[in-house]
Amino acid sequence: MSKIVTVGVVLAAALTLVGCEKVENAGRKAARKAGSLVGRGSTEFFSGVGEGIRTVSDGNVPDVLTAIATRKSIRKFDPLRTVEDEKVEKILKAAMCAPSAMDKRPWEFVVVKDKAQLQKLGERLPYSRVANGAQLAIVVCGSLDNGLPGRGKEYWIHDCSAASMNILLAAHGLGLGAVWTGVFPGEERIAAVREILAIPDGYAPLNVIPIGYPAEDPAVKDKWNPAKIHADRW
């Protein structure tokens, strides 16, 4: 059996980066112990990823924290390279590993590959023009009735945002580029996406995430600012 993901890393990193693996016996023991939590399908998925971030020790790819720090928004994509279906599936699996309020998992994902559809999104959405040049886009949608009472219904925004971050990090880990372009809460943008993608009532698009192989390499920004940290109280 190939290297096995340390389940402790998977569960602790809400930003599940596809393919982070360990070969230590402790990792295997943890994977078996957490089998009831992770499930057979998820365990096989995380242990079998070969294209993305494989392991810290092989020296070819970054560890989790480095991957988080080096992720950047990509707005230009290589038109000649098609994103493999296997990578798209891994990205979506990573998205569905996100946390959600009361484990309601209110998300739905529309994978857009049709060039005409991508062009429509780019034309109708001011922040999503880059979708025209992308190989695909994932539109993250949430259920407006997630089964939670009162203001809890609004938690779909948090849940789908967590899933969206997983998408960005998984894409980065698989050698792809992606960018989060906002839809919600703009009413005109929401209406446009509903129309183009035939999104049913009861669901709202949070964003459009164009994805493809990068055709640019912008500098990584150092966003660390200790002045933003407050100890015990503001």
Name each model-derived stretch.
Residues 7-13:
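Sec-dependent N-terminal signal peptides
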Residues 20-234:
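Acidic, surface-exposed loops and disordered segments
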Residues 1-7:
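Bacterial N-terminal signal peptides that target proteins for export
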